[in-house]
């Protein structure tokens, strides 16, 4: 059971980091990035459909996203979804494709985005700490039930602490990289 507890904690911490990475990818840093559109849902024949499943998204220039729908009839639906998505971008529809021009970020907006990155990092760290707490509680229960000795419990708790520290470092590293990308963009 003890190795299962460690493995489960590691898996859950890895999931928290992956969620954080997805969140970071959706933050606009002044450069075109197709991940910006990952969460855009288009009302298509009455059903919400991810934009990425109904169009090809290319980056012809560093600050331009080009959206080419597989079905030309969905062009207006895609445009409406982009306007409603709170991305802060205005789509340009030429009848065949939609262009999204990513504006240059102002210094003030860069600071706001950097704060957002920090907030997301803190959320990810809280998720990691919650996983740590659950693992520690599980180890205490194992020891109380007589399945592991106190020494084994202490050693396993050290392992849990190590993977917690590693996960927190990874989150900090990702946040620093994103902040650097934002401030240099």
From Swiss-Prot:
Subcellular locations according to the entry: Cytoplasm
Annotated region described as Disordered, given as residue ranges: 140-168
GO biological process per UniProt: translational termination
An example molecular function term from Gene Ontology annotations: ribosomal large subunit binding
GO cellular component: cytoplasm
UniProt KW keywords: Cytoplasm, Protein biosynthesis
InterPro entries for the chain: Ribosome_recyc_fac, Ribosome_recyc_fac_dom, RRF_sf
Functional note: Responsible for the release of ribosomes from messenger RNA at the termination of protein biosynthesis. May increase the efficiency of translation by recycling ribosomes from one round of translation to another.
Family note: Belongs to the RRF family.
Record's protein name: Ribosome-recycling factor
Species name: Lactobacillus helveticus (strain DPC 4571)
Gene (UniProt): frr
């Amino acid at each position: 059971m003890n190795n299962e507890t460690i493995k489960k904690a590691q898996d859950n911490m890895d999931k928290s980091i992956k969620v954080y990475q997805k969140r970071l990818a959706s933050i606009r840093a002044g450069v075109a990035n197709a991940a910006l559109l990952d969460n855009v849902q288009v009302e298509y024949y009455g059903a919400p459909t991810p934009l990425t499943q109904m169009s090809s998204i290319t980056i012809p220039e560093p600050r331009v996203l080009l959206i080419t729908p597989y079905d030309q009839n969905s062009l207006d639906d895609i445009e409406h979804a982009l306007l409603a998505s709170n991305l802060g971008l205005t789509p340009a529809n030429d009848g065949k494709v939609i262009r999204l021009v990513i504006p240059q970020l102002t210094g003030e907006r860069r600071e706001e985005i950097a704060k957002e990155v920090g907030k997301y990092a803190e959320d990810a760290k809280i998720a990691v700490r919650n996983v740590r707490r659950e693992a520690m509680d599980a180890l205490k229960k194992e020891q109380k039930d007589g399945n592991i000795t106190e020494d084994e419990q202490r050693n396993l708790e050290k392992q849990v602490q190590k993977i917690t520290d590693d996960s927190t470092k990874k989150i900090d590293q990702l946040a620093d990289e994103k902040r650097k990308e934002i401030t240099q963009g």
